[in-house]
Each structure stands twice: as C-alpha cells, then as structure tokens.
Amino acid sequence: MTPHEKVIYIIQQLELSDSKVARAISKSKSTTTHKRMNLRGAKFSEEEFTNLRDFYIEKLRKIEIL
C-alpha cells in the first residue's frame, strides 16, 4: 500500500472527517480535502500517514488505559 492508500484506509476505518484529519496532520481542511479526493494529483505523503497514525494510536492508548 502507498502512504496515500494507508491514509485513505485509516480515514474510512475510523470514519474521520477532513477537519479531523487536517488537525492530525497539521494541514488545512482544504488541503486535506484535495488530497482525499486526489484533485490535481494531490496525495498524502509518508510523513502525513505517520502523523495521522501516531495521533490516533495515542488517542486509542489513552482509551485503553481507562
């Protein structure tokens, strides 16, 4: 899987909105929307995948501790 495909998979599995993804990867909502829709060849990078993954893994760890 490419980094872009991995991000799309996470978005689908966690049912994330563009604004939540944007916050996790430190990008604007419009940039995130363009990348999600693959407009003009815009795709998520490896760094953005890592940021998104780490952001939500940390949240899940906090839930697990409860």
Specify the residue positions occupied by each region the protein language model found:
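DNA-recognition alpha helix
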Residues: 25-26, 56
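Short, flexible helical or helix-coil boundary motifs
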Residues: 14, 18, 59-64
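A short, Lys/Arg-rich alpha-helix, primarily the initiator
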Residues: 1-14
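The alpha-helix within a helix-turn-helix
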Residues: 11, 22, 53
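Short alpha-helical "recognition helix" segments of helix-turn-helix
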Residues: 19-25
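DNA major-groove recognition helix of helix-turn-helix/homeodomain DNA-binding modules
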Residues: 45-63
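Short, charged recognition helix plus adjacent turn
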Residues: 9, 34, 61-66
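Recognition helix of helix-turn-helix/homeodomain-like DNA-binding domains
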Residues: 27-43
